[in-house]
Regions:
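Membrane-helix exit/interface motif
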Residues: 52-65, 83-91
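Hydrophobic alpha-helical membrane segments
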Residues: 76, 80, 84, 100-120, ...
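Alpha-helical transmembrane segments in multipass membrane proteins, preferentially the mid-helix core
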Residues: 79-94, 148-150
Length: 169
């Protein structure tokens, strides 16, 4: 019970720190950018979610880690990494908004489901082995960035205003 409480406290602190960093540093930079430029660095970050496949590697995680937890978490991360790369490729296309919504909904649901499944099976933090840092440090960052993408997607889109208008002849 004590270690599970420490696990939860670690996650809570990460959410607080990443949330403060987002408010103080990330959002002030992103809010002044157009949609494509604002989401691009976030998509690159999420493209690394293939690292979730490490939940399937013996020796990295405990053999006692439930496969009913590890498999959906690993493959959900892989799917989200692929969706992030597809959204990056489509940033300048007519499918940009749709690909961003798909990436963001699937990615956020995947992370929330991972926390839910870990709680449902009463995951013992020690079973995570070297992947302990993923749910305690990385997932809070990823969820904060999903919130930023939702905020970017929900804000009104304005057309770019040319710096100078051509002179009438």
């Amino acid at each position: 019970m004590f270690y599970t409480a420490l696990f939860g406290i670690t996650i809570a602190f990460s959410f607080v720190v990443w949330g403060l960093a987002a408010r103080q540093y990330f959002w002030p930079v992103l809010r002044g950018r157009g949609r494509a430029d604002a989401v691009r660095p976030i998509l690159y970050l999420h493209a690394f979610r293939f690292m979730g496949l490490t939940f399937l590697i013996p020796g990295v995680v405990s053999p006692d880690l439930a496969s009913s937890f590890a498999r959906p978490v690993a493959y959900g991360d892989l799917a989200t990494a692929i969706l992030a790369l597809l959204a990056l490729a489509m940033l300048d296309s007519k499918l940009s908004a749709a690909s961003l919504w798909l990436f963001n909904i699937v990615g956020a649901v995947d992370l929330l489901n991972a926390y839910y499944q870990g709680n449902r099976i009463s995951l013992v933090p020690g079973q995570l082995g070297a992947t302990y840092v993923i749910p305690t440090l990385v997932v809070p960052l990823l969820l904060v960035t999903h919130a930023l993408v939702f905020r970017i997607l929900l804000r009104p889109q304005t057309q770019a205003i040319p710096r100078s208008l051509p002179h009438a002849a």
